[in-house]
Amino acid sequence: MAPVRGDGMRGLAVFISDIRNCKSKEAEVKRINKELANIRSKFKGDKTLDGYQKKKYVCKLLFIFLLGHDIDFGHMEAVNLLSSNKYSEKQIGYLFISVLVNTNSDLIRLIIQSIKNDLQSRNPVHVNLALQCIANIGSRDMAESFSNEIPKLLVSGDTMDVVKQSAALCLLRLFRSSPDIIPGGEWTSRIIHLLNDQHMGVVTAATSLIDALVKRNPDEYKGCVNLAVSRLSRIVTASYTDLQDYTYYFVPAPWLSVKLLRLLQNYNPVTEEAGVRARLNETLETILNKAQEPPKSKKVQHSNAKNAVLFEAINLIIHSDSEPNLLVRACNQLGQFLSNRETNLRYLALESMCHLATSEFSHEEVKKHQEVVILSMKMEKDVSVRQMAVDLLYAMCDRGNAEEIVQEMLNYLETADYSIREEMVLKVAILAEKYATDYTWYVDVILNLIRIAGDYVSEEVWYRVIQIVINREEVQGYAAKTVFEALQAPACHENMVKVGGYILGEFGNLIAGDSRSAPLVQFKLLHSKYHLCSPMTRALLLSTYIKFINLFPEIRTNIQDVFRQHSNLRSADAELQQRASEYLQLSIVASTDVLATVLEEMPSFPERESSILAVLKKKKPGRVPENEIRESKSPAPLTSAAQNNALVNNSHSKLNNSNANTDLLGLSTPPSNNIGSGSNSNSTLIDVLGDMYGSNSNNNSSAVYNTKKFLFKNNGVLFENEMLQIGVKSEFRQNLGRLGLFYGNKTQVPLTNFNPVLQWSAEDALKLNVQMKVVEPTLEAGAQIQQLLTAECIEDYADAPTIEISFRYNGTQQKFSIKLPLSVNKFFEPTEMNAESFFARWKNLSGEQQRSQKVFKAAQPLDLPGARNKLMGFGMQLLDQVDPNPDNMVCAGIIHTQSQQVGCLMRLEPNKQAQMFRLTVRASKETVTREICDLLTDQF
């Protein structure tokens, strides 16, 4: 039977049918192998294949590849199809190349030449196929090879409209991967004037291209503003006939209108020319007027298109923020949407009003819709709409309506969705502090927050109320009385106990004159909560008790009894034992004057802006109005562990000597008019394995990079900045190691010329041999690639290899270096030993060249369980019940190298009183003792 000619390929259809009918994986593989053998024989046979046959077999290969099987032949036949004059054959050839051929192929020069031939063709179909192939591949090589031809096609008067459209989209694709390929100078004006093209497809594609170009170089393309305003005006004004044939459900050119409105939002102010600005305002008013007209169709497509243009026009009005009349009209229009039946419209209206609320011209107008927004918060079925209503209430809040909004949010908080409670708590806390005229109201609000949603009250919130109470003398007595009453509730959240314990410890004497809150009553009330709390809260309460001894000497005996109970083995927590023991001795030994000095009232905290704002912005960077986010110029806020330490260790009266970060969050200063840069708002992608870029190519000031932590673990995030995240997973066996580096592109554009290079000298390679596989030179937007490294320890070494990573981002060269987590301890093998064999070996390694010792200050308050956890991750065997002193930690292990095995013993002795460590390392090789000692010093 003669083969079927035309587009229908019977053989391909039969093959696909056979594959679908396979009952098992084995049957499928067998059928595929049979077909591959047949195709290979046809390609290698003496009989010349015609275009139809080549097309059919190439299609089969493409189908097999899409099933997940590797294809290692047929590439030349596909390239030959590019020379065909038949559309169907040329199309299949381009399809095969786009999918299977990579930029490193030996055939790439032939492919590029074939594409150039098609670009010069007079057949627009062939030109379009070539442009689509270039855009699909989109590599740097393609950009460099066709950087001259494509712009010429785009602006040439001889080019057909359909080709111009494809050329604009192709150039946009290449620009995203290689921003430097777009020519400047006279080309700029010619590209901009495409906005006047009469073909709908050309002007739409050109607008997308110009929008991308403007974002990169707004000054060079500023001439597009006048043309965009003029074109937009002609589209939306009925007296013109521009593109009136391109209507979508009675809306003229809605997609182009939206693109033009977005293009204009790249400039602020949009234009300085009075005539252009007047025409733009007239156009925006026309769009708002059309929104008030009765719908011309009941179909949803009409309303969708009409509202798309309207919302983008409102976004431009908000962006300009200079026309009070337009802002008020936009607000009124959005207010009508708040009661619309369509959920999406209500959501978009709330979102746009959040931005309008930040403008001085429309803030009061937004407030007129407060009752409707409150109703949306309570009654909406969709949680995302309720969330947006909360955001709008937060944005419209000021001194005039703060108490009402805060109360409504508190009322709703009791029944709010769990997914939005934490964010609501932060917003209520910020509003209560920012607009408090009476700080007793602020205290009431925060305590209500803890009572209603205690689990969602972060540490920053209750630290903040403590600081404000300490800094505001007029509210201290009220705060003490209020927390005392709150603690009398049968069920009391632990955060309430923390706040109550701290405030009563400082100001309990202000309410002690009332018999209902006598000293003993305060103590018993707090202690009744003690056994229900976590160790951290118990530690804070013990500090409160020692403060009580200074405030109320008459209950000294009661408190000392509690200290005695917890200074012995009845307390399983070593920190509580130590704290109780020290406080007991302090209360017994110290005189009244000494006790009063040590336990004096906490001093006022330095005034600064609250960082709860930064916490809120980090949680929802896109949901917080920018003018509400002001970055503090004060030192960094307190970390969780350090804050707790400052709270529970105040009895030592050494706050000023603690870490620079160990102070509570600062009191808010009067709000500034400057918009903070929000440097704390950049979210990190911490869980890659388990949203300002600097112009300097080496600017990594905001990078997260700490290789020290990898002394004790093998997996995690090695490096992170705004553009790139590098994760690592590693495994080691004896003297061999294998690392997987995961490079994640966090940007919206590809990183090109991506090149990690190992920095490791030939001399160093004699000790540690590291081999690294090559990675692809382009890291696509949002993508992740993996690079494998192997390491062989030949002999012990002191330093670790460095990897230098370079790439181009938006045309700017970026380069930085990081150390690989390949310290010598990675080649440890844990060794079990009993006490007798350990100390026998310890004694044998007593020579001067067999030991290294260092005494160093603890980097943080002594954390023995934490130190043990670190040592267990270091690679050696942590030996239990070997050292007579249970606080001491001893380890044993063998470092495997190619040349020898080096036994190593380690002893870490903590001194709790001095807050110091003594580290001793003994090994049969002097260099190993120094290397291990240097690695572990200052790590505890």
Swiss-Prot record:
Topology within the bilayer: Peripheral membrane protein
Residues that bear Phosphoserine: 632, 634
MF-aspect GO terms: clathrin adaptor activity
Residue numbers spanned by region Disordered: 651-679
UniProt KW keywords: Cell membrane, Coated pit, Endocytosis, Membrane, Phosphoprotein, Protein transport, Transport
Tissue distribution: Expressed in the Garland cells, imaginal disks, adult midgut precursors, the antenno-maxillary complex, the endoderm, the fat bodies, and the visceral mesoderm and cells of the CNS and PNS including neuroblasts, the presumptive stomatogastric nervous system, and the lateral chordotonal sense organs.
CC per GO annotation: AP-2 adaptor complex; clathrin-coated pit; plasma membrane; presynapse
Effect upon mutating residue 207 to A: In RNA edited version
Compositionally biased region (Low complexity): 668-679
Listed SMART domains: Alpha_adaptinC2
Compartment list: Cell membrane; Membrane, Coated pit
Sequence ranges of Polar residues compositional bias: 651-662
GO BP field: asymmetric cell division; clathrin-dependent endocytosis; endocytosis; follicle cell of egg chamber development; intracellular protein transport; mitotic cleavage furrow ingression; positive regulation of autophagy; positive regulation of endocytosis
InterPro entries xrefs: Adaptor_Complx_Large_Subunit (IPR050840), AP2_complex_asu (IPR017104), ARM-like (IPR011989), ARM-type_fold (IPR016024), Clathrin/coatomer_adapt-like_N (IPR002553), Clathrin_a-adaptin_app_sub_C (IPR003164), Clathrin_a/b/g-adaptin_app_Ig (IPR008152), Clathrin_app_Ig-like_sf (IPR013041)
Function, in words: Adaptins are components of the adapter complexes which link clathrin to receptors in coated vesicles. Clathrin-associated protein complexes are believed to interact with the cytoplasmic tails of membrane proteins, leading to their selection and concentration. AP-2alpha is a subunit of the plasma membrane adapter.
Subunit structure: Adaptor protein complex 2 (AP-2) is a heterotetramer composed of two large adaptins (alpha-type and beta-type subunits), a medium adaptin (mu-type subunit AP50) and a small adaptin (sigma-type subunit AP17).
Family classification: Belongs to the adaptor complexes large subunit family.
Name of this chain's protein: AP-2 complex subunit alpha
Organism, as annotated: Drosophila melanogaster (Fruit fly)
